[in-house]
Amino acid sequence: MKLSVISAVFVSLAAAAAAKTTPTREVAAAAAVPDPVQDGIAKNCKTYYQAKPGDSCQKIVNDYGVFTFGDFFKWNPAVGKNCESLLGGWYYCVGVPGTPSKCTEKHPTPTQPGSACKCGQWYKVKKGDNCQALEKKFKISDKDFRKLNGGLNKECSNLQADVNVCVKA
């Protein structure tokens, strides 16, 4: 009898201890890595895209509209700096934690990489345009223009002619 009481107490204590050490917070499971992928793909990738024949890195960046070419290259370094190793049929990372989902809003193409998904007004950049001129023309602050077009570098030297930028939220 003493042995069964002691056993019952021990089992109760063990169960209580286990309950106290069990985490109460759920951790999101990582996305299953599809096959095939190139070496060096981001370990924390949560969203993958299967490249089609004829795709380019810039096309993928433009189609998703929520990350820059720099992000794409960082997540998929094996594609090469000039995207020379992008392979149709292979999977590429198009989202890590914190990356918004693919833009589903209608927008003109091509768009400046990193442009806002939801945009109230688009403008097709002309040869000779620069950030300051567009900010003045559309009465938008530099801070807001860059927020709407997150892929622009500090010098704004990557603003491209014949590409659409967001000029109004």
Curated annotation (Swiss-Prot):
Keywords: Chitin-binding, Repeat, Signal, Virulence. CDD domains: LysM. Disruption phenotype: Lead to relative tolerance against H(2)O(2)-induced oxidative stress. Impaired fungal virulence in both injection and topical infection bioassays using the last instar larvae of the wax moth Galleria mellonella. Impairs fungal propagations and ability in suppressing immune responses in insects. It comes from the Eukaryota. It holds the Pfam family LysM. SUPFAM superfamilies: LysM domain (SSF54106). Residues 1-19 form the signal peptide. The keyword Coiled coil does not apply. PROSITE patterns: LYSM. One of its GO terms (molecular function) is chitin binding. Residues 47-94, 121-167 form the LysM domain. Induction: Expressed during in vivo infection of insect hosts. In plants, chitin acts as a microbe-associated molecular pattern (MAMP) that is recognized by lysin motif (LysM)-containing plant cell surface-localized pattern recognition receptors (PRRs) that activate a plethora of downstream immune responses. The LysM (lysin motif) domains are small globular domains involved in binding chitin in eukaryotes. Blys5 contains 2 LysM domains. Secreted effector that enables the plant pathogenic fungus to manipulate host defenses for successful infection. Required for the full virulence to infect insect hosts. Protects fungal hyphae against the hydrolytic activity of chitinase and plays an important role in evasion of insect immunities. Binds chitin and can additionally bind chitosan and cellulose. Coats and protects the cell walls of insect pathogens from host cell recognition and additionally shields fungal cells from the hydrolysis of insect chitinases. Belongs to the secreted LysM effector family. This is Secreted LysM effector Blys5. It comes from Beauveria bassiana (strain ARSEF 2860).
